[in-house]
Structures are given as C-alpha cells and as structure tokens.
Amino acid sequence: MNLYEVLRRPLISEKNSVHATQNKYAFEIAKGANKRMVKLAVEQAFNVTVEDVNMLHIPGKQKRMGRNLIQTAGLRKAIITLKEGDKITLFEGV
C-alpha cells in the first residue's frame, strides 16, 4: 500500500478541534493500514514528528430503507499525537 493511500481525509469536529490544542489530530485511514504506515504517511505528508498513534475501528450501522435493512460502511480512524511545537496547518482556521 502506497503511503499516500493510507490517509483518506482529516476528521474535523468540535471534539477534534479541542484535541488540536493538545497536539492531537484525527484522520480517516485505509482499512489495511497499521500504526507504522500511518506514522510514516503523516511524517512525510506534513513534515512533523509523530509521538503516538491511536487507532479505532468504528463499525457500520444498520439503517432502514423502507422494509429493507442495509448496512452502512464502517470507518477506521487514527488519532495522531505530535511532538510539542509541531502543528498541522491543514486544521487551522476551521
């Protein structure tokens, strides 16, 4: 897997903006990615030093479409802690 395929998109919410003050940023990541891949991808893409990577798997939910039940897609999320003094400017001003 290419390192630029690992990070899908940044996750921006109120909770994540509070975490950004503590140098923690959240990204949606590819299903097959592991912590080493995520760390390398963030360090190469944003020129920062990653201290820690926490990963979560959020399962999909069942929704109703008329009489039918469908399963929504799940999500894989990574919370990245950066070294003190480093910032990702992608999240600023949001």
UniProtKB/Swiss-Prot annotation:
<comment type="similarity">
    <text>Belongs to the universal ribosomal protein uL23 family.</text>
</comment>
<dbReference type="GO" id="GO:0003735">
    <property type="term" value="F:structural constituent of ribosome"/>
</dbReference>
<keyword id="KW-0687">Ribonucleoprotein</keyword>
<protein>
    <recommendedName>
        <fullName>Large ribosomal subunit protein uL23</fullName>
    </recommendedName>
</protein>
<keyword id="KW-0699">rRNA-binding</keyword>
<dbReference type="InterPro" id="IPR001014">
    <property type="entry name" value="Ribosomal_uL23_CS"/>
</dbReference>
<keyword id="KW-0694">RNA-binding</keyword>
<comment type="function">
    <text>One of the early assembly proteins it binds 23S rRNA. One of the proteins that surrounds the polypeptide exit tunnel on the outside of the ribosome. Forms the main docking site for trigger factor binding to the ribosome.</text>
</comment>
<dbReference type="InterPro" id="IPR012678">
    <property type="entry name" value="Ribosomal_uL23/eL15/eS24_sf"/>
</dbReference>
<comment type="subunit">
    <text>Part of the 50S ribosomal subunit. Contacts protein L29, and trigger factor when it is bound to the ribosome.</text>
</comment>
<dbReference type="InterPro" id="IPR012677">
    <property type="entry name" value="Nucleotide-bd_a/b_plait_sf"/>
</dbReference>
<dbReference type="Pfam" id="PF00276">
    <property type="entry name" value="Ribosomal_L23"/>
</dbReference>
<keyword id="KW-0689">Ribosomal protein</keyword>
<dbReference type="GO" id="GO:0006412">
    <property type="term" value="P:translation"/>
</dbReference>
<dbReference type="InterPro" id="IPR013025">
    <property type="entry name" value="Ribosomal_uL23-like"/>
</dbReference>
<dbReference type="GO" id="GO:1990904">
    <property type="term" value="C:ribonucleoprotein complex"/>
</dbReference>
<dbReference type="GO" id="GO:0005840">
    <property type="term" value="C:ribosome"/>
</dbReference>
<dbReference type="GO" id="GO:0019843">
    <property type="term" value="F:rRNA binding"/>
</dbReference>
